[in-house]
Regions:
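Helix-to-loop junction immediately C-terminal to a conserved catalytic motif
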Residues: 26-58
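Short, well-ordered coil/turn elements that cap or connect secondary structure elements
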Residues: 33-35, 49, 72, 89-92, ...
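Catalytic core of membrane glycerolipid acyltransferases/transacylases, capturing the structured
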Residues: 48-104
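Glycine-rich, highly charged phosphate/nucleotide-binding loops
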Residues: 36-39, 105-109
Length: 245
């Protein structure tokens, strides 16, 4: 455990031995089970100071683990409130998960996310709100991601994911091997862009379409895979963040 912790600390110098050990476990899981290929654009990890919103496309249930495995900073993921199940509470607490209710009560989670960003933290979000199905088609980005970016002034760190398991449920992806690829793109600063919330969401959506080369689907016409980890969180942000002064 000590060796693992020291290895993790070389990647994340600001964390303790236990956190470093957990990082090592996640990294080895990603590389062994999913044969993950981590591609980071030059200079990105030297430019991660300050508040940051990690924006990813959503391919399967293990996406947060893959992304966290490569990040030199802790990513606090936004998660649906009803995933706060008893036997996983210790893990969610350790991971710093920010729970967001699927209804009007979600504003407390959104407020916590904004506070975390104000304190210079990093949060992770999937603007599609659901897992992409059929595999290889991007779901429209919900406007909530633009609201969060606009209101906080945080920079966006785009992460493009592909090659993950095309399986029936989000949980199946945990033990199904794959050839995953995680691409960390350069941060985007929208603070002086003059774009509104909806325009920011649209701009991010178009960037991901360009990066993936995929087509844009529609929730109304296509089947989506239910994912309790992130389902409806972004829509909750869209609905509730407007009520927060």
């Amino acid at each position: 455990m000590v060796a693992g912790g020291l290895h993790g600390r070389t990647k994340r110098p600001q964390v303790g031995v236990f956190d470093g050990f957990m990082f090592l476990i996640g990294y080895l899981y990603s590389r062994i089970v999913h044969r993950a290929d981590f591609v980071v654009e030059e200079g990105v990890f030297e430019d991660l100071d300050g508040p940051m919103i990690v924006v990813c496309n959503h391919t399967c249930g293990i996406d947060p683990f893959l992304v966290s495995a490569v990040m030199p900073r802790r990513v606090c993921w936004l998660m649906a409130e009803d995933m706060r199940v008893g036997w996983l509470v210790w893990f969610w607490n350790w991971a710093g998960v920010i729970f967001v209710a699927r209804n009007r009560h979600g504003k407390s989670g959104i407020r916590r996310a904004r506070t975390h960003l104000k304190d210079g933290g990093m949060i992770g979000i999937f603007p599609e709100g659901h897992i992409e199905r059929p595999y290889g088609k991007l779901l429209p980005f919900a406007p909530g991601v633009g609201v969060l970016v606009k209101r906080t002034g945080a920079r966006v760190l785009p992460v493009v994911i592909d090659g993950t398991p095309d399986v029936a449920t989000a949980w199946d992806s945990i033990y199904t091997s794959s050839n995953a690829r995680v691409r960390v793109m350069r941060p985007i600063d929208y603070s002086d862009s003059g774009l509104g919330s909806a325009e920011i969401a649209n701009d991010l959506e178009q960037r991901f379409l360009d990066w993936t080369g995929w087509e844009l689907g529609s929730r109304k016409t296509r089947e989506v895979q239910h994912d309790e980890l992130t389902d409806d969180v972004v829509q909750s942000i869209s609905d509730d963040s407007r009520q927060i002064a």
